[in-house]
């Protein structure tokens, strides 16, 4: 079984306006869409689309949290999310116009997870994950999430004999690597930040990844339009 863990759930609120978005003007909407946000849940959506069994877990709150679960279930995701009372799943507001110059993105921080919520995730992983399962932690945890709690969740997975995949950044990436994950997937900027030097060519990345081979079984570094490099 594949499990995905979304610690900072989100709803993408996509607003498309007519013409070009203009300051100090009445920009009329052409279309408004609500969609699932959060990296890990997107993994579950992709797996479900390919009819690959998986379970998605995490913490949601309020009407936006309920909407996120409903949208995920409509896409075939087997959801096992827990609700934190008096909190609201964050919105990522995406503004699109017809200029062809890209979008504007305004992202809320998300709510602080309670001790009870963190324990629910831990208990779910402990009770359900089995040897050789795959558990995906993708995205950055919400504000105030203690690095010790993050490592504790990862270690539950490792102690169960499951395969750990981490797609995160900064201190959370560093912590994931102390658990010797099966795979990590930073982007080019996150990877350069981690190794504390700039990389310019494919050979630069290949040589840097050779230095990191003891930290994870597999590395995939996404390079934007240039594709990805894996080791």
Predicted features by range, described:
Residues 148-231:
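Conserved phosphate/ATP/ADP-binding segment of small-molecule kinases
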Residues 1-57, 65-67:
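Glycine-rich phosphate/adenosyl-contacting loop at the front of the ribokinase-like
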